[in-house]
């Protein structure tokens, strides 16, 4: 637990004023994920996608949909519509399951310019975040937040400081 809390603390320091959130439950067994989520929050993360850890330890539950959520729908539009219907426009939509540019366009069409956020989980995160920010702004979604995920550590977070990223999902 102390190794996870220490790593989380280093990531929070590298992230500066951008929040870090635990999304590591997909990478380890169930009970290790619960312990790691608690340790990450002790290290400064602002919440966890692990609902059991949130319940057991009174942590803030956060999260977005996974790629499998999009894949079980007929298309991205229906996946986004389902998520927005269930969680409201302030939700964060995962936009890199297929084609990022098309997904961002669809996300704003479905949720409107009040869309809470988008998540990018693959590719060159800095370059992709810049392209997505430009596209969101052009579509009128100027307040939509960008979260990036995918094998992040303190070095990756430091390298992303100049990118238009609002938060990090780690794990």
Regions flagged by a language model, labelled:
Residues 166-171:
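Glycine-rich phosphate-binding active-site loops on the catalytic face of alpha/beta enzymes
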């Amino acid at each position: 637990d102390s190794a996870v809390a220490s790593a989380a603390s280093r990531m929070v320091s590298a992230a500066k004023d951008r929040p870090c959130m635990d999304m590591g439950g997909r990478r380890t067994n169930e009970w290790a994920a619960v312990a790691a989520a608690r340790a990450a929050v002790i290290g400064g993360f602002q919440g966890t996608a692990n609902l059991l850890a949130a319940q057991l330890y009174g942590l803030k539950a956060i999260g977005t949909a996974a790629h499998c959520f999009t894949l079980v729908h007929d298309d991205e539009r229906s996946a986004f519509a389902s998520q927005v219907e269930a969680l409201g426009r302030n939700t964060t939509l995962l936009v890199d399951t297929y084609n990022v540019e098309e997904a961002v366009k669809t996300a704003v069409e479905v949720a409107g310019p009040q869309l809470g956020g988008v998540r990018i989980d693959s590719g060159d995160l800095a370059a992709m975040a810049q392209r997505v920010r430009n596209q969101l702004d052009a579509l009128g979604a100027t307040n939509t937040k960008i979260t990036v995920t995918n094998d992040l550590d303190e070095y990756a977070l430091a390298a992303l400081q100049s990118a238009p990223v609002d938060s990090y999902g780690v794990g």
